[in-house]
Amino acid sequence: MQVFTGTDKVKRGLAQMLKGGVIMDVTNAEQAEIAEEAGAVAVMALERVPADIRAEGGVARMADPKKIKEIMSAVSIPVMAKVRIGHFVEAQILEALGVDFIDESEVLTPADEKYHINKHAFKVPFVCGARDLGEALRRIAEGAAMIRTKGEAGTGNVVEAVRHMRQIMDEIRSLVLLPDEELVAKAKELGAPLDLIIETKKLGRLPVVNFAAGGIATPADAALMMHLGADGVFVGSGIFKSKNPRKRARAIVLAVTYYDDPYVLAEISEDLGEPMPGIDVRKLSESELLQVRGW
């Protein structure tokens, strides 16, 4: 029997299995266990949550393999880990460790300011960030099996995630209405392959799952992103930078499931303790923005 391990179809199918769920950033085995108990569909293993990366500065790299293995041993749900944009050797290391997904992430300090990783060269599926349809389709062309909005990680401010999700969804709606004879010009405008433009127009959505990420800190934030068309939610600093991580983690998982029921949302949002401190994105300089990394 022919086995199709590592094909685009298989990798996209693995990402589809996470649909409707919450993926949580964790920095140790204890946090990973809290995330799993709360109902997370996967965890993202990293050295520091985005809020700490933003506050401490310096160069942010792939997490220590020892830490990643400890997290993998602690939970039964899929484990993801981040690599720097363009750093294919970090990705090779993570694949050798046996992680379930690799996130080529703008949250870490880019290793290559010109090229992203050729993700087709790997058997493990990749997730990548995007601010608009062009970015999303370029990452998919490189082999990404999953897209997430970039938002502005580590701020606790959902405004950029909202902007990016609305932008992607608006562009898809416009593409669906575009006459076929204009698709080649649209592909040139977006810097994306024509076959992906045609597929997206036919589907009326991205060819891969599209999660929301970047600044999601409350159950209401998570529910909002689901209303805007997200297939699920990444939560970075919002859980473990809050006063009651265990309770907030569970509430955000429930919010993604019951995003269309304001009565349930009201109940699960009660008495969660202080959320993570937020940052006004408008006060960040261009050099402080993480979302501008990549192309």
Curated annotation (Swiss-Prot):
GO terms for biological process: amino acid metabolic process; pyridoxal phosphate biosynthetic process; pyridoxine biosynthetic process. Gene3D superfamilies: Aldolase class I. PROSITE patterns: PDXS_SNZ_1, PDXS_SNZ_2. Its EC number is 4.3.3.6. It comes from Dictyoglomus turgidum (strain DSM 6724 / Z-1310). This is Pyridoxal 5'-phosphate synthase subunit PdxS. NCBIfam families: PRK04180.1, pyridoxal 5'-phosphate synthase lyase subunit PdxS. The active site is at K82 (schiff-base intermediate with d-ribose 5-phosphate). The keyword Chaperone does not apply. D-ribose 5-phosphate binds at D25, G154, G215, G236, S237. Pfam families: SOR_SNZ. Pathway: Cofactor biosynthesis; pyridoxal 5'-phosphate biosynthesis.
